[in-house]
A protein has these predicted regions:
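Signature of Gram-negative outer-membrane beta-barrel scaffolds
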Residues: 35, 61-211
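Outer-membrane beta-barrel domain signature, strongest for Gram-negative TonB-dependent receptors
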Residues: 1-72
Length: 211
């Protein structure tokens, strides 16, 4: 390829088409060994945010809010072009090289294989290889109390929430048929800050503070 020889710097489309076109099965149909795939990322996202402020007197102020995010994204690929063939078989060609004697291990859709006794036969537009959802839930509540009593000022803040993420597989692969563990994180944070105007320095500081 460093000498810019075309057969190394470009795909040999004629060869790909010829391999598929001449690869006949027992029924006289052409089984594609090479295809063009389309990798898809289909995303759904909902975000909400609220903010409230309550000040019954000039000495006391309460603020708070909530944020919520839900995201569900599907990752999959589908057949875009059979390159001269009639169909494609939904198996892992790399696994077939190493585990050819174990039909279950080479399946991209293990449940389909168990149900039908054979690998899935695909046409243009069919999903194959992998298909799963990535789910994210992020919920946060926060609040702040502010006291202003002449020379004495105080702030109390608290934040809590839940962050959850997990993968939802839509097919089971023969090499890795098990389930993934869910991820879940509980968020909590708080801070207390008091000041006295005579000195202008904090006399109490607990938790995280940007002041």
């Amino acid at each position: 390829w460093q000498q810019n020889i075309p057969q190394y710097t470009h795909l040999n489309w004629d060869r790909l088409y010829n391999v598929n076109y001449n690869n006949f099965d027992a029924n006289g149909l052409r089984r594609s060994k090479y295809v063009i795939e389309e990798r898809r990322v289909d995303q759904n996202d909902v975000s909400l945010s609220t903010h409230v402020k309550y000040q019954p007197t000039k000495f006391f102020t309460l603020t708070g809010g909530m944020t919520f995010r839900w995201n569900k994204t599907e990752y999959y690929k589908q057949i875009d072009d059979l390159l001269g063939g009639d169909y494609y078989v939904n198996i892992d060609s790399f696994a077939e090289r190493d585990f050819a004697s174990n039909a279950a291990m080479i399946q991209n859709d293990l449940d389909y294989y168990f149900k039908h006794g054979a690998a899935q036969v695909l046409s243009v537009g069919d999903k194959y290889g992998y298909d799963y959802y990535a789910n994210v839930f992020d919920e946060t509540l926060w609040g702040n109390i502010k006291l202003d009593l002449g020379g004495f000022k105080a702030n109390l803040s608290v934040k809590g929430g839940l962050n959850e993420f997990y993968r939802e597989g839509l097919v089971r692969k023969g090499l890795f048929p098990g389930l993934d563990e869910d991820g879940k994180e509980i968020i909590f944070d708080g801070k207390v800050l008091t000041t006295y105007d005579a000195a202008g320095k904090p006399i109490t500081s607990l938790g995280k503070s940007d002041i």
